[in-house]
Amino acid sequence: MTAILERRESASLWGRFCNWITSTENRLYIGWFGVLMIPTLLTATSVFIIAFIAAPPVDIDGIREPVSGSLLYGNNIISGAIIPTSAAIGLHFYPIWEAASVDEWLYNGGPYELIVLHFLLGVACYMGREWELSFRLGMRPWIAVAYSAPVAAATAVFLIYPIGQGSFSDGMPLGISGTFNFMIVFQAEHNILMHPFHMLGVAGVFGGSLFSAMHGSLVTSSLIRETTENESANEGYRFGQEEETYNIVAAHGYFGRLIFQYASFNNSRSLHFFLAAWPVVGIWFTALGISTMAFNLNGFNFNQSVVDSQGRVINTWADIINRANLGMEVMHERNAHNFPLDLAAVEAPSTNG
């Protein structure tokens, strides 16, 4: 009889825990995805802060030339970064216990792999938590779908690209200057500016910014007057009010006359779906582009594609970009190889002396 009571009490304890985890009454919703999200993101954040401040230099290229990335080793906020795991490690799983010592683990850039893998797991769980909370509240699932765009982008630069290139050392460094370095090298090696998926991503980000500014300014310009000239217009809105706070007919009429009638939405729901879908689809395409270029399916190559009747090359902007790419490729990892792959692939002319 005692054993039965103990089992019921433990089941009740587990039940209370489940109810607390899935309760929508908590100040912050936890959820089952949150059970995994919280420790992974806390780990990634903690290690990032410590490594950004105090990590020793990392042998990123695997040639015994460590690169400094932390504040205590001479960097500032702009130049500092978490240096990617060494090329000597490649794609190997490299937890602390796989190294001979903590010093070796730090020298080979172990913190980068730890941070990136925990971070990707954490943001994926955050996306799942968004869906979970929407489900519990009876909402539609589009918040999590929208968040999938930045999750896909982060996964592309931190995981898919290193897998395609064969080493975590090719992943994006975790810092401001490191991000710029990654972008420049990516352009040099993959000609991303000439990739149509990147172009769609640019249209998504810039177009999304434009549409957001247009929508916000139209709404703000067509607010229904509820206040005097001496009060803030924001005082005319009360949270939860049933009445519209702006005149969508006036906004529609203004924009329809500014451009043309059918350029303006007359349905608030389809308008807001469009505002969400445009940047999300654009960023999806960019992430897909990064993932294809990871395996060297690169941007368009129009180098020396225009010639005159004598066969002489007429340079276009594509040739200017190509020259810039070669210059950037020559400069990066300059001690790891003598020539960039484009130049080294050409057989050297023989000299008969």
Curated annotation (Swiss-Prot):
- The positions annotated for binding chlorophyll a ChlzD1 are 118
Subcellular location, principal:
plastid
The residues annotated as site (Cleavage) are 344-345
Where are the bilayer-spanning segments?
A: 29-46, 118-133, 142-156, 197-218, 274-288
| Coiled-coil residue windows | none
Q: Enumerate the residues binding chlorophyll a PD1.
A: 198
The UniProt annotation places [CaMn4O5] cluster binding at 170, 189, 332-333, 342, 344
Q: Where in the cell is it found?
A: Plastid, Chloroplast thylakoid membrane
Question: Where are the N-acetylthreonine residues found in this chain?
Answer: 2
Q: Which residues bind a quinone?
A: 215, 264-265
Write out the residues that bind Fe cation: 215, 272
Question: How does the cofactor bind to this protein, according to its record?
Answer: The D1/D2 heterodimer binds P680, chlorophylls that are the primary electron donor of PSII, and subsequent electron acceptors. It shares a non-heme iron and each subunit binds pheophytin, quinone, additional chlorophylls, carotenoids and lipids. D1 provides most of the ligands for the Mn4-Ca-O5 cluster of the oxygen-evolving complex (OEC). There is also a Cl(-1) ion associated with D1 and D2, which is required for oxygen evolution. The PSII complex binds additional chlorophylls, carotenoids and specific lipids.
Q: Read off the Gene3D superfamilies from this record.
A: Photosystem II protein D1-like
Which residues are noted in the entry as pheophytin a-binding?
Answer: 126
Q: Which Pfam families does this chain map to?
A: Photo_RC
Q: What else is known?
A: 2 of the reaction center chlorophylls (ChlD1 and ChlD2) are entirely coordinated by water.
What's the stated role of this polypeptide?
A: Photosystem II (PSII) is a light-driven water:plastoquinone oxidoreductase that uses light energy to abstract electrons from H(2)O, generating O(2) and a proton gradient subsequently used for ATP formation. It consists of a core antenna complex that captures photons, and an electron transfer chain that converts photonic excitation into a charge separation. The D1/D2 (PsbA/PsbD) reaction center heterodimer binds P680, the primary electron donor of PSII as well as several subsequent electron acceptors.
What protein name is recorded for this chain? Photosystem II protein D1
The record's gene field reads psbA
